[in-house]
Swiss-Prot record:
This is Ribosomal protein uS12 methylthiotransferase RimO. Keywords: 4Fe-4S, Cytoplasm, Iron, Iron-sulfur, Metal-binding, S-adenosyl-L-methionine, Transferase. The gene is rimO. Its main location: cytoplasm. Residues 6-116 form the MTTase N-terminal domain. PROSITE patterns: MTTASE_N, MTTASE_RADICAL, RADICAL_SAM, TRAM. It is found in: Cytoplasm. Residues 373-439 form the TRAM domain. The lineage of its organism: Bacteria, Pseudomonadati, Pseudomonadota, Betaproteobacteria, Nitrosomonadales. Catalyzes the methylthiolation of an aspartic acid residue of ribosomal protein uS12.
Amino acid sequence: MSLQSPKVGFVSLGCPKASSDSERILTQLRAEGYAISGSYDDADLVVVNTCGFIDSAVEESLDAIGEALAENGKVIVTGCLGAKSDVVKAAHPGVLAVTGPHALEEVMTAVHANLPKLHDPYTDLVPPQGIRLTPQHYAYLKISEGCNHRCSFCIIPSMRGDLVSRSIGDVMTEAENLVNAGVAELLVISQDTSAYGVDVKYRTGFWNGRPVKTRMTELARALGSLGVWVRMHYVYPYPHVDEIIPLMADGLILPYLDVPLQHASPRILKAMKRPASSENNLARINAWREICPDITIRSTFIVGFPGETDEDFECLLEFLQEAQLDRVGCFAYSAVDGAAANALDNPVPEPLKQERLARFMEVQESISAEKQRRKIGRIETVLIDDIDGDQAIGRTAADAPEIDGVVYLSGADGLQPGDLVEAQIVNSDGHDLWAAPPARD
């Protein structure tokens, strides 16, 4: 009579970086012979990977822990909210264990203590690319953990610590395994991608027997040699970022940069403890476009930061008009427990925050709609994400999954997720595109 593998349920919340942590835990669980359960009822215990960045995320995480306790009763908590174990235990004293983020060993120790693995399990081999939560054709590639910045609105360093870069050999081996498994797009993520290697003084590592520096430019060049889409996220606008723009112009990596600028007013940027200035950022953006005219620049901003005046906000709107960014997200400032910004004077009233958010989005939507309209008639390469009847849903090089727009492509016969196809853009709105197979002469 064969022994049955112990079963672990898993709930993953939060950002792509948290998803990457979840994938590592799931991979280790499978490597040790644990089965992964898709339901509370069938699981012997449940691991909940939490988010704790803003109050709404804390509430969602606590609700998820409560649901897992109610439905299963045996719960291990990890992730960013786990860094505040007192908050978790005060709300849910019945949890088995609480660990912080990026804590694979601690999670596995807690699992072993509460659900011992089989001594000699007969398990399926874990694939080289590991267990993934994303679709098979794209994957997040985390290159570092933590952050050396101390932005006044952010508590990430207190939860995830200072910057720790992965060795470039490990990153490239993971990337190769993903590509060999059929991944068509690698999304490079971290807390600060442009700082990759700073903590190890850009130490030289090895990949396939070749020396490669632990540095963003060298990493981008190496990833580009794998022959798949490579998309760069969470890039601070440091001067050395200029080095990867020619790689985009040459088609080695996607002409796409996710650059979190957060504001444009010098006074607010200083209060936020953000690097660079709006003037430098604008000059750098213009220089990038000179080198690579097709570059897509995504950014995020915060309105209603403590002390933000009408003049500061107008400065931000002026920057939007001048920068003509392609993809933009914006949030009304929300106090985060433990953030230095909570102590700043002159908080902005909530109704005014929402008014500014609406005005900001109105300006940006006009910019985005015009940029989308200019794509009508162009032939674009589209990565297929999904098939819905006779229609395919995909993305261009200008669109990251989940946060940007999509392309609705008619005539999906024979297509499947992961395919790269040429399509002619026939219509647009401020977010999405509609396309058809290119007209034949």
